[in-house]
Amino acid sequence: MLCRLFTLFITAALACCVAAIPLQGQQSNSIIERTPGRWPWHPHRPRPHHPRPHWPFPKPHWPKPHWPKPHWPKPEPEPTAVPTMAPEPTTVPPTEPSGTYPPETTPTVEPTVVPTDVPTTFPSMTPTADPTVAPTGTSVPTGVPTGVPPMPGTIPFGTVINQCTVNGTIALTFDDGPYDYTGPLLDIFAKNGAKGTFFVNAMNFGNIMDYADVIKRMYKEGHMLGSHTYSHADLSKLNSTGIALEMKKLDDILAPIIDGNRPTYMRAPYFAYSDTVSKTMAELKYHMIDANIDTKDYEHATPDGVPISVENFKKGLEAGGTITLCHDVHQTTVELLIQQLLDEIKKRGLRAVTVGECLGDPQANWYRPAQ
């Protein structure tokens, strides 16, 4: 029985093997056809490449729309305008203003102070000057610029004066102002009961119209105002016409500020006197004031230089000097120097007065009154 079962099993197994052979070949061919490039190819053989058709999908090509170009009508050319000439305006020739008027120009840079040399011998002086000022051709009549002549006195016109005649007096004089420090200087004088003399310009460190209140206060408090020319010009380089114009222009500005009065005292910038200057000043009725004590505050306009200016003042007093040259345009002069000079004057038993007072000239003669 067992033998028969074994025989049947072997026979069935062989039959299955025989039946499976054609099925395996057909299955292999089907796999190859479905999966090209893979098994049963040898791993060292190159695999065939079968690109996929239409991959990636092609982009659709839509036809571009055709838009007709707009046809705008061309603008017609505008007619050319023919300019018409307007009649020229009638011009009136300018005339030089009189009285109060602003100066022609306002300086934007602080001018350089040119030192004034004061000799050491008395009473005569040898002035020095260096700046160059071109003479002006503007015609100005000779004689007294405006107003009536001053009252008769003993002080000569057109003569350089550099020494006081009244004993016990000292004249502190200030050139080139008014400026920012002139007002505080008046406060110092008021505190000490002293008077000063101011030789002013219209255009130098500042515009005199900007300091009209200071000028008016100076006049009201009894200080003396003198002319230092309109623009700080070197009068020795001008003719008589140019000299007269410099004096007249300043007088025309000062007069409305000080009740219509005009100074009769003057000081030439740089102490630049000449025969022409003296002759012209005699015709214009001006007293010419120099100095015989020079503090040289313009050379020592720093706190460290103030002791040098004080020493110069003391040496001038010991040499017999009485008219002192200072400048109210320097801050150190006003804030540090002047009080020391006033203290030295009091210490020596002297009085600080105006030039007119130290010459014995009445105050009525200091100005030319208005007509």
UniProtKB/Swiss-Prot annotation:
Keywords tagged on the record: Carbohydrate metabolism, Chitin degradation, Chitin-binding, Cobalt, Disulfide bond, Glycoprotein, Hydrolase, Metal-binding, Polysaccharide degradation, Signal
Active site as annotated: 175 (proton acceptor), 327 (proton donor)
CDD domains: CE4_ClCDA_like (cd10951)
Sequence ranges assigned to domain NodB homology in this UniProt record: 168-353
Coiled coil stretches, renumbered: none
Enzyme class (EC, first level): hydrolase
Signal peptide stretch: 1-20
Gene3D superfamilies, sorted: Glycoside hydrolase/deacetylase
Cofactor: Co(2+)
Transmembrane segment boundaries: none
InterPro entries: Glyco_hydro/deAcase_b/a-brl, NODB_dom
Free-text function comment from the UniProt entry: Hydrolyzes the N-acetamido groups of N-acetyl-D-glucosamine residues in chitin to form chitosan and acetate.
Protein name stated in the entry: Chitin deacetylase
Organism: Arthroderma benhamiae (strain ATCC MYA-4681 / CBS 112371)
Gene: CDA
